[in-house]
A protein has these predicted regions:
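Bacterial Sec-dependent N-terminal signal peptides
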Residues: 1-30
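Short, low-complexity, polar/charged sequence segments that are solvent-exposed and flexible
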Residues: 187, 210, 228-232
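Extended serine/threonine-enriched, polar tracts that run as long, contiguous segments within proteins
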Residues: 180, 185-203
């Protein structure tokens, strides 16, 4: 009975400490004095640029493409860093997580590996359960009985630094009303590295959830992204996606079998197939205005 009480005490203390730490990470303490020579107001009051109205009759051609944004590429680092929240910036994953868990302005959708059509809405408790787990195999020395080790569950949380890729679902289309080939992102899905029960890497990816991109745009428009060479002209996450300031590769295109590239190509052939799909879109646009 005594050991049970000690175990419960350690569990409660550890949970309280970790919860307090998590709150500090998610919401850093505001500074006593302004951190800068002027007050930044442009980003926090910005609004996402409305999409141009699109009629079905104006879409002459369209193709759905699924991409992968690898955050290990240098051009994609503004989406990955900072790995810890600071006063004026967050990583893309922290922005999504805060908006989903704290503000409720972004909806997450479950079963990302088999469904990307935003059908299985997740509650806040389901999101929290997905991102947080407890390791019940951890032990700690009994403070009242030195030399004796007892169970001490450890909280494991999926942090921003663990998210290394994103799936992007988007539609390319030709609008004859404006005579332009345009693209609109439909959804984003963060990926983490899949690990075994012992914590070893498997080399595979684990999809967390899908978010509907148009719903994310107002949130992204108010979050700064680091810009090299000039801190006074920083962009937002909305700018990054609107201006296509990221690198990616194609993992799937709309097809009769609904297959991903890796299901029928491997290795170098898969890379070449990805480039072929990208080139097909480029050639289509080029041929439209080639005389």
């Amino acid at each position: 009975m005594k050991k049970v009480k000690i175990l419960l005490t350690l569990f409660v203390v550890a949970f309280a400490a970790l919860t307090s730490y998590a709150q500090e990470v998610l919401a850093p303490k505001p500074p006593k004095y302004p951190d800068g020579v002027y007050t930044k107001e442009n980003t926090r009051t910005r609004r996402a640029i409305p999409y141009t109205h699109l009629r079905e009759a104006d879409v002459m051609w369209s193709k759905r493409v699924w991409r992968v944004i690898d955050l290990r590429e240098k051009i994609n680092h503004p989406l990955y860093y900072p790995d810890q929240i600071i006063l004026d910036r967050k990583s893309l994953f922290d922005v999504i997580k805060d908006a989903a868990l704290k503000d409720g302005t972004i909806t997450c959708f479950d079963q990302p590996g088999i469904d990307d059509e935003f059908r299985y809405e997740m509650t806040k408790s389901e999101i929290d359960k997905l991102l947080v787990s407890w390791d019940s195999t951890a032990t700690a020395e009994d403070p009242n009985n030195p030399g004796t080790y007892i169970s001490a569950p450890v909280k494991n949380e999926i942090a921003s630094i663990s998210v290394w890729k994103y799936w992007v679902k988007e539609d390319w289309f030709f609008d004859k009303q404006r005579s332009v080939l345009d693209v609109r992102i439909i959804g984003l899905c963060p990926l983490v590295e899949k690990k075994t029960e012992t914590g070893e890497s498997t080399g595979a990816d684990k999809a967390l959830f899908w978010v509907y991109f148009p719903e994310c745009r107002p949130v992204f428009a108010n979050q700064e992204v680091y810009m090299r060479h000039n801190d006074a002209e920083r962009r937002t996450f909305e700018d990054i996606f609107w201006k296509r300031m990221f690198s990616s590769y194609v993992r799937k295109e709309s097809n009769v079998y609904n297959r991903s590239i890796v299901e029928y190509k491997t290795g170098l052939d898969a890379l070449l197939e990805s480039e072929r799909i990208k080139n097909d879109v480029f050639v289509y646009e080029h041929d439209l205005f080639h005389f």
